[in-house]
Amino acid sequence: MIEVLLVTICLAVFPYQGSSIILESGNVNDYEVVYPRKVTTLPKGALQQNYEDAMQYEFKVNGEPVVLHLEKNKELFSEDYSETHYSPDGREITTYPSVEDHCYYHGRIQNEADSTASISACNGLKGHFKLQGETYLIEPLKLPDSEAHAVFKYENVVKEDEAPKMCGVTETNWKSDEPIKKASQLVVTAEQQRFPRRYVKLAIVADRRMYMKHQKNLKPWVFQMVNSVHQIYRSMNVLIALVYLNIWKKNDKITVQSASDVTLDLFAEWRETVLLRRKKHDCAHLLTAIDFDGPTIGRAHIASMCNSKLSVGIVQNYTEINLVNAIVMAHELGHNLGISHDGNQCNCHTCIMSAVISNPPSERFSNCSEDYHQSFLTAYNPQCILNAPSKTDIITPPVCGNELLEEGEECDCGSPENCQYQCCDAASCKLHSWVKCESGECCDQCRFTSAGTECRAARSECDIAESCTGQSADCPTDDFHRNGQPCLSNHGYCYNGNCPVMHYQCIALFGSNAIVGQDECFDFNMKGEQYFYCRKEYEKYIPCAQEDVKCGRLFCFYTNNMDICRYNYSDIGIVDHGTKCADGKVCNSNRHCVDVTTVY
């Protein structure tokens, strides 16, 4: 057996610290210069790879020696990964590049219990690592014939825009009428209690603005983002694998606009009608360099994973720091996976699912995030993310009866004496001839469930219960009542299966004691200035007309606070698209309060 390869790279730190420099990550105030020297010892007869499976770096940070261990992330790409771009004349070109010998790594600092690292070794060393609770970035210095790199703290990168940034999701969580339950309180199956690993095949679409911004560096930028997202979700036992990349080089396939809710809806429609037919995947995210209205830098549909209509997210490339953009993507993926924003009851107020991006950004999930995700798995049972790795990944010779599903086997339940799986013929490791299905919401004892059996209950009055067809193991696509139908005793109107009302949006931001501000608070939206406006066009804040004030800034306050128009940085959201703004009227995508009978 070939011994595990160990590569040692020594970084000598010059006795020099720069005061200020412009790097790819931005303007850095304080940094150290290091020079990597690679020392490789290959086992006799071993095949030289472009990028080794394991590497070790030794260098100094603040004069103290550290050892950085790295391992190639072999789960970064799905086995059927493909890319689509477009020729100058608009022809679609899809390729299936080899991605096995890639250059993206995860790692840790030796003797640091909570350390992490996400590094690209494609052209020098670029990425981040955590040391003694602080986040450090490393990237090559672009000097001729030099191996010089810069190492610097995240806090030493000058932020061009210090205003708080936030997720655009302000609707209440997907089970707003029930308090969050701990995972231990849920009625779950034995399989779910074991926290089985989930597998998300992620499709990424980059719009023309992203291509114009990054050009030839766009693909490595995306790969490093997903590499960091993959690492973040390890703690949740969720594998994020890139299955597809589509670059809109010449023209955008939708009208990407600054209204994030409109862009999200347009992308969801394109994904359902075009992308799903082109490439099988579980969730799709759009990366754009457009500046969304207000402080919004991302948006996604909550509890939408595996939903053909809604399993999407959008992420604004608002900073040159790759890690921060990856954290925004991880946040929006969290919404897809049923995770709502962290509230006051959570043990962490600066974690990934905080509505406002923390500074420095966190790579941790709170206890609430874990509970929300487990609640989602139990309530929805999303089948698409329970797919185990391909059987071809197992390279040992198959042995029927060893309880391992191997190549050439349809099932393996152990010996005939011990087999407890009625669908499987233990002697042949094949399914019985009468078996119609093995799993699924509409599969019962290896046969399709009778037609008409409810397989997905209505989650709200705007949702529709689905029933089995008797011809498939899968529950039909999640559908909902028509947009504009009255809901919550006429306090709102249905929109994409939800009933968006201001009260629940306030609860999502502030907790159960929050209520909607007084009517006079919303008159501030006629000012047309930062935080008080209806929409933003070309960096200009457009004031609301009197009749549209409840489609601009959302005002909330606590019931025990006499300042009824109080607002702060954690409440900088715009009223949601589809929210009732007057009797018979809702907010449209242009932030006008319009007749509900004409908007949908």
Swiss-Prot record:
Ca(2+) binds at V399, N402, L404, E406, E409, D412. Expressed by the venom gland. Residues 397-483 form the Disintegrin domain. One of its GO terms (molecular function) is toxin activity. The active site is at E332. InterPro entries: ADAM_Cys-rich (IPR006586), Disintegrin_CS (IPR018358), Disintegrin_dom (IPR001762), Disintegrin_dom_sf (IPR036436), MetalloPept_cat_dom_sf (IPR024079), Peptidase_M12B (IPR001590), Peptidase_M12B_N (IPR002870), Reprolysin_adamalysin (IPR034027). GO terms for biological process: proteolysis. Pfam families: ADAM_CR (PF08516), Disintegrin (PF00200), Pep_M12B_propep (PF01562), Reprolysin (PF01421). It is an enzyme of class 3 (hydrolase). This is Zinc metalloproteinase-disintegrin-like stejnihagin-A. It comes from Trimeresurus stejnegeri (Chinese green tree viper).
